[in-house]
Amino acid sequence: MRDMMGMMKQAKELQAKMKAMQDEIATMEASASSGGGLVTVTLSGKGTLSALKIDPSLMKEDEVEILEDLIIAAHNDGKAKLEAAMAEKTQSLTAGLPIPPGFKLPF
């Protein structure tokens, strides 16, 4: 019975820590650039694109496809940075818990 109570207490503590981590992640931002800084994006912790900067030299009709590719590349880089930061925070939170490798938490 004591073990069950201890597990319940640990679960509540973990739940509170996860909520705090989710709140912290929501306030994070990640910026990434492509094309040597010609395109820069900023993503919120939830992955929403919050800012986009484009160098005016790319505003040419014959360079639309290049611009599109640079925006996608910058966005993907920013998303990868956010995912890495979230994984690091999650790993520190769940250290010592028997979670299978590759298991993704629901946030």
UniProtKB/Swiss-Prot annotation:
GO terms for molecular function: DNA binding. It holds the Pfam family YbaB_DNA_bd. It comes from the Bacteria. It is found in: Cytoplasm, Nucleoid. One of its GO terms (cellular component) is cytosol. NCBIfam families: DNA_YbaB_EbfC (TIGR00103). Belongs to the YbaB/EbfC family. Binds to DNA and alters its conformation. May be involved in regulation of gene expression, nucleoid organization and DNA protection. Homodimer. This is Nucleoid-associated protein BMEA_A0033. It comes from Brucella melitensis biotype 2 (strain ATCC 23457).
